C-alpha cells in the first residue's frame, strides 16, 4: 500500500518547494467539463468537426439542401448545442464533414419545438466508413461510438424523419474517450488534507458540465 507523507507540493527548477494546503474558508467557483485532461488525439477529433455543416432538405439526395448551421469553436470533447434559425419544415437532415476531415463525430441529437428528441426513420449517407463506425453510430444514443470516414472526401451522414419537421435544436459531440462531464451523472469533488481525502461537494452533471 502507498503511505502518504504529507500534503502535495510544487517543486520548482531551483529546488525550492511550495506546499499545497486546502483553504476551505476561501472557495472559488469552478466549471468542470472533463474528468481528465484533453489528449492530443481528443483535440484532433475536435478539430475535425470544425466547420462541419448541418443541412436540411425535402429531397433525399439533398439537391435542395439548406445549410442551417456549422460546428464552430469545437475545442472540448463534450456536447455542444445551438438553435438553428430558418423557416419551414423538412423531411431530411444531414451532417457534412468539412474538408480534410475523417468525420469522427460521436453523436447528433435533433429536437423539435417542444423539446422532444426526434427519432430517425432511416439513416443513410456516404458509404465508405471505417468498419464499426458506420452511419447509424451517429444516432445510436451512445456517445462512445462514432461515425468515421475512410478518407477525407467531405463524407456525410443523413437521416429521414417520420414527417417534415422544423428542427429547433441540434446537439452534437465529437468522437471522445468518455471523460467529459455527462448530463445526469453524479460527481464528487474531494480535496486532500494531511493524510486523507475529504468530500467537499457533490453535484449532478448538466449540459454545461458541473459548477463547483
Q: What kind of region is each of these model predictions?
A:
Residues 1-66, 74-212:
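Aromatic, loop-rich ligand-recognition surfaces of beta-strand-rich domains
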Amino acid at each position: 500500500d502507498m503511505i502518504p507523507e504529507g500534503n502535495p507540493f510544487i517543486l520548482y527548477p531551483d529546488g525550492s518547494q511550495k506546499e499545497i494546503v486546502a483553504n476551505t474558508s476561501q472557495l472559488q467557483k469552478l466549471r468542470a467539463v472533463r474528468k481528465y485532461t484533453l489528449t492530443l488525439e481528443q483535440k484532433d477529433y475536435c478539430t475535425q468537426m470544425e466547420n462541419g455543416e448541418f443541412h436540411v432538405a425535402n429531397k433525399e439526395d439533398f439537391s435542395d439542401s439548406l445549410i442551417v448551421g456549422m460546428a464552430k469553436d469545437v475545442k472540448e470533447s463534450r456536447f455542444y448545442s445551438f438553435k438553428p434559425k430558418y423557416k419551414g419544415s423538412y423531411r431530411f437532415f444531414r451532417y457534412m464533414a468539412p474538408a480534410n476531415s475523417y468525420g469522427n463525430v460521436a453523436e447528433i441529437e435533433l429536437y423539435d419545438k417542444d423539446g422532444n428528441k426526434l427519432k430517425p426513420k432511416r439513416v443513410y449517407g456516404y458509404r465508405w466508413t471505417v468498419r464499426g463506425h458506420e452511419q447509424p453510430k451517429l444516432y445510436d444514443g451512445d456517445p462512445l461510438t462514432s461515425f468515421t470516414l475512410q478518407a477525407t472526401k467531405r463524407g456525410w451522414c443523413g437521416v429521414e424523419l417520420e414527417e417534415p419537421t422544423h428542427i429547433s435544436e441540434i446537439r452534437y459531440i465529437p468522437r471522445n474517450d468518455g471523460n467529459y462531464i455527462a448530463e445526469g451523472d453524479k460527481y464528487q469533488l474531494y480535496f486532500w488534507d494531511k493524510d486523507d481525502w475529504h468530500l467537499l461537494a457533490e453535484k449532478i452533471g448538466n449540459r454545461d458540465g458541473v459548477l463547483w
